[in-house]
């Protein structure tokens, strides 16, 4: 889903999902800046989440300094949001650079970076507290 505004400017819009988090990334030519919900990625407090978000950019190396990325993400917790952002960025970079080399690099590193993680929470069953836990049984 790429849109070419002119011969010089190329903008790619991509999305990623993880559990209940949904991220939409807009990638365009720039100097390597990354914003998550209009906040620079450097200000994200959770170090593990920040590392997850920056994984695709670290993998492609110097190519990351040629694009600016803006991501809007909502839903879920901070870690599933980080995973959704990572998926959206990776998909967008593959589409932006239109390179099989970048795609194979991401797939070799982690196949869920492009395809997403299919795991979901198991639904709650009737007659139970949650999906697996049952009511406490008393014998006396």
UniProtKB/Swiss-Prot annotation:
GO cellular component, one term: cytosolic small ribosomal subunit
Disulfide bridge map: none
Gene Ontology MF, one: structural constituent of ribosome
Gene Ontology BP annotations: maturation of SSU-rRNA from tricistronic rRNA transcript (SSU-rRNA, 5.8S rRNA, LSU-rRNA); translation
Pfam family, one: Ribosomal_S9
Ranges in a coiled coil: none
UniProt keywords, alphabetically: Ribonucleoprotein, Ribosomal protein
Listed Gene3D superfamilies: 3.30.230.10
SUPFAM superfamilies for this protein: Ribosomal protein S5 domain 2-like
InterPro entries registered for this protein in UniProt: Ribosomal_Su5_D2-typ_SF, Ribosomal_uS9, Ribosomal_uS9_archaeal, Ribosomal_uS9_CS, Ribsml_uS5_D2-typ_fold_subgr
PANTHER family listed in its UniProt record: RIBOSOMAL PROTEIN S16, RIBOSOMAL PROTEIN S9
Family, similarity comment: Belongs to the universal ribosomal protein uS9 family.
Protein name: Small ribosomal subunit protein uS9
